Amino acid sequence: MAKRQVFFSFEYNKDVWRAAKVRNMGRVSEDSTFSDNDWEEVKSKKDSDIKAWIDDQMAKRSCIVVLIGETTATRKWVKYEIEKAYELNKGIVGIYIHNLEDKDGNQTDKGSNPFYSIMTNNGERLSNYIECFDSEYKSSKFVYNDIADNIENLIENAIKNKAPR
C-alpha cells in the first residue's frame, strides 16, 4: 500500500507529544509531516496568515487525520481544518489519542467528537459519516500498536468513503 500524504490536525498545546508519536509511526509519507517549529512560527501570526498556511498544507494532502484528545473538539483551528478538508473533498478520519501517554506519562479523558458540530452541505452532522477510531486498549503501548496497525487502512477508507457533498 502506498504511503499517503496526510494532514494531521490536533490541539497543539495539549497533544503535541501524543501527535508526534502518531506522526512518527512511519505509516504515512514523510512529506506529510511538518515540523513543530513550522506550527510554532505560524501560530504567532494573524488569522489570515494561519488560514493561508493551513490552506496551502491541506491542498497538498489526500486526507486529514484528526487526532482527538480531551479538548480537541473545542479548538478553533481544528474546526477550520476539518471544514477546509470537507470543502476540498479530502478524506477525513478521526483517531482518539487520549490513552497515549504524554511526555510525563499521563493519559487524559476521552474528548468529544470534533465532527459533531460541523454540518455537511445537506444539513447533516459530519459525525454521521466520519469514522473515529478508538482503541479498545487502555495501556498506552497497546494503544500505540493498535493505531500503528490500523492507521493505513483508516486513511484508505476515509479517502474511499468521503462524506457526501
Regions found by a protein language model. Name each.
Residues 1-60, 149-165:
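Conserved N-terminal substructure of TIR/SEFIR domains
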Residues 5-7, 18, 103-165:
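C-terminal interaction surface of TIR/SEFIR-family domains
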Residues 21-24, 79-82, 107-110:
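Short, glycine/charged-enriched secondary-structure capping and boundary segments
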Residues 34-36, 94, 131:
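Structural signal for conserved beta-strand scaffold positions within catalytic alpha/beta enzyme cores
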Residues 40-48, 68-72, 99-105, 129-133:
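Low-complexity, flexible helical/coil segments
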Residues 50-66, 116-126:
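A broadly tuned preference for mixed-charge, low-complexity surface segments
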